[in-house]
């Protein structure tokens, strides 16, 4: 089994505790007999921008039907469609609908959505090339452990940045999962260690290998992970 580790995913900004647990999980895979190989996904840096253009566009078209007439919440017996949509969607949904409508609007489609779609193909090609060399790719799931409930609700940019390691797999249409491989203290001064996830990615329709690697690693690390689990979990 050849397992790829993309160099672009191990960047400045990963919390030290997260890096330590991820390194430990990769070392365990090597110990279990896997061949660990560095791979390159050169268009990784564009993934977040591309995702947050394409995803809201899909959201806005998908949710357009929820006008309170045939689908969704209805305000005042259907007298006010605008109020039906305002009341029926939360702030984040509204934000994504508005952003998606903007990037699909006349004059901006080519500048944003079309260009993002072209870069998406480059990201797909990066993964295809990498999977011609390895069977599985592993990365951190996120650069940090989870933040406190409600902490970044009013800062969507920071919320979106936490997706930096997972969006490219979605853009490329790849199967993946996040496996807890340890615990780490938040670097913002938290006092409770929180789970660290290892993202395990397979090639297109390669779910079986993803589950296989995840199961073997989970069994091998169960004692270690359980020994670090805080009493509050």
Regions found by a protein language model. Give the residues of each.
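Structural helix-boundary/capping segments
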Residues: 1-12, 23-32, 65, 95-125, ...
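Gly/Ser-rich, acidic/histidine-flanked active-site/gating loops
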Residues: 1-59
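Serine-dependent amide/ester hydrolase catalytic core
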Residues: 9, 44, 67-171
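Short glycine-/acidic-enriched loop or helix-start segments at secondary-structure transitions
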Residues: 14-15, 48, 109, 147-150, ...
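Short secondary-structure junctions
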Residues: 35-39, 73, 227
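Short beta-strand segments at enzyme active-site cores
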Residues: 37-41, 139-140, 176-180
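Short low-complexity, flexible loop/linker segments enriched in glycine and/or proline
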Residues: 50-56, 153-155, 186-187, 193, ...
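Active-site phosphate/pyrophosphate- and oxyanion-stabilizing loops and adjacent acidic/basic residues
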Residues: 61, 166, 215
